Every structure is written in C-alpha cells, then in structure tokens.
C-alpha cells in the first residue's frame, strides 16, 4: 500500500493551491449540495398560491386543503428517518442524488394530477425527497467546510430554500394568468426541472471526507480536505481529528485501511443516542430537538404557506394584490437570509438566535394584535391596522431569516459527534418536518378556533419560551472544530451544575 496522502502533502507543500482557490472549492461544494434546497423551497412557495386555484378547481374543503398543504412534511418523516442510515450506507453524495430523484418524480406526479388522491400520491413521493434533502445538505456541507467558514457555508441550504420559495411565489404570480385548470399544474410541474440540474451537478461533487474516513479511504479523504481547507496543515489536522473521533489509531496512515470495529461501529448508535447517552450527548440531543421545535412551532410555515390568506384577512381583497404581497414576503425573506448567512461566523450562532427570536416575538405580538383589531371591526377599513399587519409579516420573516432560519441548520449539523451525526441530525429533521406538517395542517382550523390574530399570539408565546430556552441551554459553537463539540457541551453542562451548586452553597452559608 502507498503511504497516506497526509504524509505526501507535507512534502509537496510548494504545490499547495492558493487559499482563494480552496475557498472557492468549498463554496462550490456547498452550492451543489444546496441545490436540493431550491427544489424544496420551490415546492413550499408554489403551494401557497397554487392552493388557491387547486381548491377552486378540485372543489376542496378547508380540511382537505390543510391536509394537502401540510402532508408533505408528514410524508417527509419517511425520508428523514431513512436518511441517516442511507447516507452512512451510500454516502452523502449519492443520498443527495436519491433526494433529487424523489423530487423529480413527485413534481411530475403533482403536475399531471387529475384529482385529489392523485396529487396526494405526488405529495408523498416529493415528501420523501424533502426528508432526505433537509438532513443531508447541511450535514454534507458541515463535513466539507473548514471551521473558519463552516457557519457561512452550512447556511447555504437555508438560503437556497428561500430562493426556491421566492421562485415559487413568482411562478404563482405568472402562471395565475393561465386558465385555472392549467395554471396550478404548471406551477407544480415546473418543480421537476431543477432536479435535472441537481443530478448533473452532483457528478462534480466530492464525497464527504468524514464518510470516506469511516470507509477507511484515508487517501481520498485527505484529497478532499486538502482542497477545502485553508492550509495544508489544517487539512492534516482535520484528518487527524476525524481519525481520532472515529477511533482510528494515529499510526494507521495508509491510503486505504480496514477501520477497526467497522462492522459493529453502527450497531450501538441509537443506543448511545437515545437509550444510554452520555451527559454531553444528551445535552446535544435536547439542544438539537429544542431548536428544531422552536423554529417551526413559532409559526414560520403558517406565514410561508398561507401568506395570501393572511393578507386577505388583513384587508387585501384581490388575488393579484395578495400574490404580489406574497412575492414581497419572499424577497424580504431571501434578502435577510443572505444577511444572516454573512454574519453567522462573525457574530456567532447564539447571538443571532437570541436576536432573531426576540424580533420574532415582537413581530408576532404586533401581527396578532393588528389582525385581532381588524377582525373585531368588520366593514371598516383601518389603514393603520392593515399597514401594521403587512409590515409585521415582513419583519417577522426578516427576523426569522437573520437567525432562526439559517442557524438551526448550522447548529444542528455541527454539534453531534461524527459517529452519531447522521442519525442525530435526522432526528432533528424529523421533528422539524413533523412540526411543520402540524402547523400546515392545522393553521386554518386554529385560525377559526382562536381567530387568526389569536393564532399568531399563540406563536408569539412559543417564541418567548424559545428565547428563554436558547439563552439558558445553548452554548456558542462558532469556530469550534466538529470533533470538539462533545467536549464543549460536556463542559457547558458541568459549568452550569457548578454554578448552581455554588449558588446553593452561598444560600446555605448565608443562612
């Protein structure tokens, strides 16, 4: 066997590519991995407008419409649950291909649907692709990116989701000019096109270096790390960290090795994650599930999926005005997700989450209040309340996009130990999609039961509770190597306990 590329890399340092080329390579990898997110975002965005025409064309009830809107995320639990095992078996790259194939088939089925059951089959197939895509894109990007730009690059899936949502909104506006029975079919069927570009793009992507190490392919792993790290020395250091995390001795340096205990490496994952986790792993799991729950339970998909309905309740009566205002939501959401992505490595995950959730709480409170005032004054045109409602929808999506939107995926893709990462991330995605499905499938009923203003005040309460959770439970992870996250969470938990014990001792001494 040849000696590892790690040793070779030290010798040929003079041929090291410039740092800018390395950054561009990692940047390109992140973009290609995030293509799945454009497809997902398009589906989310396009349904907000297509639902108006589907309801009229297929004569659906409100309950049927709610199910149609939210069921994609329930179906995605199938993909999310299988994504961890699939990505460990096939690799991160071919799992992305699989997600694209499901998206392609699902979009075609929905575009050619002639009745409600037919379109639900298309939603099921596309939903499986959603589950795969939402887990694998941030995990792949986190494993390829160097620590210095990991937050920025891992935010790409959320950026592309928002670009997809905006494209869906624009598609709604233009295809709404077609006859009713054709317009919504074009809106949904066009979603198959990006899947073709995804399949082509994946051919240019390298495999995740951490997955390659798990397969014993150290030479191939180093080649990827060498192209995506800022320096040759950083690539060597990253490979050494991954080897230690996987349990490979330092003296095993050949290009291809037999990973010790590989056959049993995956057998205890769920036990270590759910049954008998260490204190640090338990903390990591709770943090991941908590942040995913808060992201969706605070009502973002109610706004994304039902923007035309919300604007109708706020006083915008024509469908054209509702769709234009919805396009504005997409523009604001996309612009601020770019802002959040650019500052996540500068200000850190924790600061953005707290700022974001605080802004969401204020926006939801104002939105709920304005909609309540409008609802209690039927027949009156309260311009200030209408203006406040429209404005606070925009500020809500803006504050969401600057923190809770991108940071959720960044944070949860980087905190799990490498052995538990795929399964841990998939659990977070499953909860995220479950909550998104619940919100999507109950918002109209919730609005009838509590009024639409009351529904948003409920979301405001969730945002307030989430802010407290983030403040007390989430440590900062900016700049921390992936292999040191378990130590970070362990020390954070220990420090919390020590501080609590110190306060108790002070109380006892004072008595």
Swiss-Prot record:
The keyword Phosphoprotein does not apply. Signal peptide: none annotated. It is found in: Membrane. The keyword Transmembrane helix applies. PROSITE patterns: MFS, SUGAR_TRANSPORT_1, SUGAR_TRANSPORT_2. GO terms for cellular component: plasma membrane; pollen tube. InterPro entries: MFS_dom, MFS_sugar_transport-like, MFS_trans_sf, PLT1-6, STP/PLT_plant, Sugar/inositol_transpt, Sugar_transporter_CS. It comes from the Eukaryota. Coiled coil: none annotated. GO terms for molecular function: carbohydrate:proton symporter activity. Pfam families: Sugar_tr. Keywords: Membrane, Sugar transport, Symport, Transmembrane, Transmembrane helix, Transport. It is a multi-pass membrane protein. The chain crosses the membrane at residues 27-47, 63-83, 94-114, 124-144, 151-171, 186-206, 284-304, 324-344, 351-371, 384-404, 424-444, 454-474. Plasma membrane sugar-proton symporter. Belongs to the major facilitator superfamily. Sugar transporter (TC 2.A.1.1) family. This is Putative polyol transporter 1.
């Amino acid at each position: 066997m040849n000696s590892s590329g790690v040793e070779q890399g030290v010798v040929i340092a003079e041929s090291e590519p410039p740092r800018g080329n390395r950054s561009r390579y990692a940047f390109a990898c992140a973009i290609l991995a995030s293509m799945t997110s454009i497809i997902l975002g398009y589906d989310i965005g396009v349904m907000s407008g297509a639902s108006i025409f589907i309801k009229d064309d297929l004569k659906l009830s409100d309950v049927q419409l709610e199910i149609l809107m939210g069921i994609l995320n329930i179906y995605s639990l199938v993909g999310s649950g299988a994504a961890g095992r699939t990505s460990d078996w096939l690799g991160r790259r071919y799992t992305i291909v699989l997600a694209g194939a499901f998206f392609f088939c699902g979009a075609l089925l929905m575009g050619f649907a002639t009745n409600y059951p037919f379109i639900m089959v298309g939603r099921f197939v596309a939903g499986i692709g959603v589950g795969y895509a939402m887990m694998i894109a941030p995990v792949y990007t986190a494993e390829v990116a160097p620590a210095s730009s990991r937050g920025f690059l891992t935010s790409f899936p959320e950026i592309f989701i928002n670009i997809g949502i905006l494209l869906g909104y624009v598609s709604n506006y233009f295809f709404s000019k077609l006859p009713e029975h054709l317009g919504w079919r074009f809106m949904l069927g066009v979603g198959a096109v990006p899947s073709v570009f995804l399949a082509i793009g994946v051919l240019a992507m390298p495999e995740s270096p951490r997955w390659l190490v798990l397969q014993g392919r150290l030479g191939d792993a180093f080649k990827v790390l060498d192209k995506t790290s800022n320096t040759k020395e950083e690539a060597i250091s990253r490979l050494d960290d991954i080897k230690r995390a996987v349990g490979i001795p330092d003296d095993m340096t050949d290009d291809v090795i037999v990973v010790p205990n590989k056959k049993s490496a995956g057998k205890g994952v769920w036990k270590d994650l759910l049954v008998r986790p260490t204190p640090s792993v338990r903390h990591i799991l709770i943090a991941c599930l908590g942040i995913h729950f808060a992201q969706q339970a605070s009502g973002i998909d109610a706004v994304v999926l039902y923007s035309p309905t919300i604007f109708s309740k706020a006083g915008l009566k024509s469908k054209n005005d509702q769709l234009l205002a919805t396009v504005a939501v997409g523009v604001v959401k996309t612009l601020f997700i770019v802002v959040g992505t650019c500052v996540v490595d500068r200000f850190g995950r924790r600061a953005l989450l707290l700022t974001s959730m605080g802004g969401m709480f204020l926006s939801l409170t104002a939105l709920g209040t304005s909609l309540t005032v409008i609802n209690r004054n039927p027949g009156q045109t309260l311009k200030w309340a209408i203006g406040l409602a429209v404005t606070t929808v925009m500020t809500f999506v803006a504050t969401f996009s600057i923190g809770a939107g991108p940071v959720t995926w960044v944070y949860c893709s980087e905190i799990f130990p490498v052995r538990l990462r795929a399964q841990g991330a998939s659990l977070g995605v499953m909860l995220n999609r479950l909550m998104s499905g619940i919100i999507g499938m109950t918002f109209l009923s919730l609005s009838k039961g509590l009024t639409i203003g009351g529904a948003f005040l409920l979301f405001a309460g969730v945002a307030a509770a989430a802010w407290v959770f983030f403040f007390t439970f989430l440590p900062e992870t900016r700049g921390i190597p992936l292999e040191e996250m378990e130590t970070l969470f362990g020390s954070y938990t220990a420090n919390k306990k020590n501080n609590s014990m110190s306060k108790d001792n002070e109380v006892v001494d004072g008595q």
